[in-house]
From Swiss-Prot:
A GO molecular function held by the record: amino acid binding
Pathway note: Pyrimidine metabolism; UMP biosynthesis via de novo pathway; (S)-dihydroorotate from bicarbonate: step 2/3
Protein name: Aspartate carbamoyltransferase catalytic subunit
Binding residue positions for L-aspartate: 85, 168, 230
Length: 311
């Protein structure tokens, strides 16, 4: 098939239409069911991580290898000319784009991935997270997991818990689910980490139902998806972190009144916000969710690097 994502930058979930998302999810499902180990043979992909990452980097690089691509890059920008010699991000991307067919990039600065597209010479840039801004590939794997567990992406009751201010995953996921009908959002966070106003305004403009809550207990019986997040220590003042981190913790007993179809998701890493007794409940799905990252990222790589895709 001829696909609309060929040679397209994947920077924000807003860059993708509902049809784009559905296409990528279908490709991810196909690749999970039937591996394609030579789909990106002879392609070279740069894995450029200017910020620490475990799951995103490893799943992206696993996705690249399992599609047959060659991988170059770095996991620590301090060992690059940018980190050691003061080279600009623009120059770094301009050079890397001469070597590769696509660039996967994580950076602590909001907007860095969008900036990189201006200097990539048309080479597709895939945002693997830019500060507290966007994390579109995490969003795609979240959508894939919701569809896998619920059989749909519409009429979903979803609660998002914890750090809704700095947590880029919840921003992107809310924007993505807003493209599908009938979804209902429950936001559970301390005032200091509440969902940003621009997200709430977007939901209001689209007449999408949402509500703000102080505890998981208030809504657990209504939910299809419970999306937990950690309080991000690296983005908070130490005293503020200590005061906030233990306010919203999920324990197995909190799920006593849950619907049978409920799944607990988490972008990981977790710290204290999900106790280990939740791991053995039928509701826990966060490790399978992480595994789905391979297929979601394979799908995007396959689409941006193949004009016609036959699976």
């Amino acid at each position: 098939m001829v696909n609309p994502l060929y040679q397209k930058h994947i920077i924000s979930i807003n860059d993708l239409s509902r049809e784009d998302l559905e296409l990528a999810l279908n490709v991810a499902a196909s690749l999970k069911a039937k591996p394609q180990p030579e789909l990106l043979k002879h392609k070279v992909i740069a894995s450029c991580f200017f910020e620490a990452s475990t799951r995103t980097r490893l799943s992206f690089e696993t996705a690249m290898h399992r599609l047959g691509a060659s991988v170059v890059g770095f996991a620590d920008s301090n060992n690059t000319s940018l980190g050691k010699k003061g080279e600009t991000l623009a120059d770094t991307i301009s050079v890397i784009s001469q070597y590769v067919d696509a660039i996967v990039m994580r950076h602590p600065q909001e907007g860095a991935s969008r900036l990189a597209t201006e200097f990539s010479g048309g080479i597709p840039v895939l945002n693997a997270g830019d500060g507290a801004n966007q994390h579109p590939t995490q969003t795609l794997l979240d959508l894939f997991t919701i569809q896998e567990t619920q059989g749909r992406l519409n009429n979903i009751n979803i609660a998002m818990v914890g750090d809704l201010k700095y947590g880029r995953t919840v921003h992107s996921l809310t924007q993505a689910l807003a493209k599908f009908e009938g979804n209902r959002f429950y936001f559970i966070a301390p005032d200091a980490l509440a969902m940003p106003d621009y997200i709430l305004s977007m939901l209001k403009e689209k007449n999408i139902a949402y509500s703000l809550h102080n505890s998981i207990d208030e809504v657990v019986g209504e939910l299809d998806i419970l999306y937990m997040t950690r309080v991000q220590k690296e983005r908070l003042d130490p005293s503020e972190y200590i005061n906030i981190k233990s306010q919203f913790v999920l324990r197995a007993a909190d799920l006593d009144n849950a619907r049978p179809n409920l799944k607990v998701l988490h972008p990981l890493p977790r710290v204290d916000e999900i106790t280990i007794d939740v791991d053995t409940t039928p509701y826990a799905y966060y490790f399978q969710q992480a595994g789905n990252g391979i297929y979601a990222r394979q799908a995007l790589l396959a689409l941006v690097l193949n004009r016609e895709l036959v699976l």
